[in-house]
Amino acid sequence: MTLFAGLARTRSGLLARLFGSRDQKVTPQWLGALEEALLRADVAVTLVDPVMAQARDLVLLEGIDTVPKVLDAVRGALVRVLGAEDLALRTSTVRPRVILLVGVNGSGKTTTAAKLAKRLKDAGESPLLVAADTFRAAAIEQLQAWAARLDVPVVAGKPDGDPAAIVFDGIAAGIARGSTTVIADTAGRLHTKAHLMDELGKVVRVAGRARAGAPDEVLLVLDGTAGQNAIEQARGFTAAAGVTGLVITKLDGTAKGGAVFRVASELHLPVKLLGVGETAADLVPMDPLAFVDALLPRS
């Protein structure tokens, strides 16, 4: 699924309120509809306020009063929120690159691990998956099934096993096999449970023993519908595991894709990947301009 298609639900809510003819004039009612549309899409009030102030200044101070020109300014403001630095996955001078996926239950970590493996394999890499979610036997089986489907090797632990030991073994296997990237799926855990976050911290430390400098990325997988709770999750996981970037999932199932701007601005963490569908190919890299254009296309 393309980014444009994946954001259809959010876009439909915005378009219904904003677009008319190319020479449509901006009115107070239209500005009110723009503000409402952004808020309904879950763009944070702290972002909507300055965006709306800029839009009103264009109309009142600069005399720009056509809808397309004002929307161009809004697009530019939203692109700047997402930034352009550090959006690509980090590389490593030492193989294998190690990527840990962390997050709460139900955020889509296991599926994201498989999608990322496919993406890297399609790019010519040799990924290896690590099923380190020992809390749920189903998660191990799910990742093994994905690995078989994608023809990607997988190292799996046993239910109730030590996840840090499994990650260590997975990295060691990646070194032995000459894998380019090891992707470890960790157990879902509440950011409010200190002992579970301590366990995650141990996983990070042990990864560094298996390969100096690992992990290269700690990606927090966030459900795109989580709203303000995503902010609290990110703070907890960053404190425990040193999160380096975000993956926002389930954007195809929500009309609130504006939450991406909220997490990017409030967390000061790069959004690196977006989940826009259920198939293995539906994981796309963040492209700020393409993302904003998918929400507010140039009619």
Task: Place the predicted regions along the sequence by residue.
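Primarily NTPase-proximal linker/entry elements flanking Walker-type ATP/GTP-binding cores
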Residues: 4-132, 138-184
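Conserved catalytic-core segment of NTP-binding enzymes
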Residues: 142, 159-177, 191-297
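Acidic active-site catalytic centers that drive phospho-/nucleotidyl reactions
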Residues: 42, 133, 185, 223, ...
